[in-house]
Amino acid sequence: MPVLHNRISNDELKAKMLAESEPRTTISFYKYFTIASPQQTRDALYQVFTALDVFGRVYLAYEGINAQISVPQSKVETFRQQLYTFDPALDGLRLNIALEDDGKSFWVLRMKVRDRIVADGIDDPSFDASNVGDYLKAADVNAMLDDPDAVFIDMRNHYEYEVGHFENALEIPADTFREQLPKAVEMLREHADKKIVMYCTGGIRCEKASAWMKHNGFNKVWHIEGGIIEYARRARAQGLPVRFIGKNFVFDERMGERISDEVIAHCHQCGAPCDSHTNCKNDGCHLLFIQCPQCASKFNGCCSEQCCEELALPEEEQRRRRAGRENGNKIFNKSRGRLNSKLSIPDPAE
């Protein structure tokens, strides 16, 4: 039986990807459908994807599939055909093509089986995830933005909303999607008679959120087909005004796609206009934050003087300090609370 996981080091894989001459296309897709055997499906898909030199991150669960990948451009159509014929439920599936793409978004293929393709925290047997809101296409989105009876709800995390969002969209202040769902219901009670329009990056979160809102008694619920990515693509193709302001955060090496010229965020260290996310270079921190080029130079890519000083220590001393810390100091921590405490940023929810 072939090896169904990667055995090559990340550094070697990244160097190999960067040396590739053929351009790649970054693609995301999802589908809520019943998978009887997620592990078996994962293993079969792994072989298909590996044969096509696909890199990226793929989650499978009994409820469906969620993928962010990159594919060699010469193999995109073959990939599409093999995906569509793999399972009847995937035939004709919409593939979201990246709006800005340097082809360097991923360098390894990771496929995992999870309890859910989106961690929602829902434990209600009466919840019907298939009873979703109506889809909105690009022209309909723009019309809704001009409708005084419509309320746009951003179902992404705080660090995504900070760098870009639709005009006048409401942010649901929470660190995770599972925390957002009950808060969205609570916050929107006063807008129960309004038209609720939900959106996210590619559609997977807002689709489930729309079903959750309907489950909680909201009757006029829509969600944007294909999320921000598909909206911007269709609006541009159709010559429509793009009403999303700023940058669309993405979960790969690019960390963002420019949608409009406006920069609506600020450097977390000096306050200068900036919407470029980075992870603190201190391996004992890796905080996700916004840093301008000047502060990146001043702090050597770190989020604080403390991390900058620690990064300058001998590697052995850095490892010793990391080993002595509590497990709660999570790598790649994106929580608003940790961001606020490390960089002294006021919490807008307070």
From Swiss-Prot:
SMART domains: RHOD. Disulfide bonds: none annotated. One of its GO terms (biological process) is tRNA modification. The active site is at residue 200. Residues 146-240 form the Rhodanese domain. It comes from the Bacteria. Residues 319-328 have a biased composition (Basic and acidic residues). Its EC number is 1.14.-.-. It comes from Salmonella paratyphi B (strain ATCC BAA-1250 / SPB7). This is tRNA uridine(34) hydroxylase. Gene3D superfamilies: 3.30.70.100, Rhodanese-like domain. Belongs to the TrhO family. It is an enzyme of class 1 (oxidoreductase). PANTHER family: TRNA URIDINE(34) HYDROXYLASE, UPF0176 PROTEIN YCEA. Catalyzes oxygen-dependent 5-hydroxyuridine (ho5U) modification at position 34 in tRNAs.
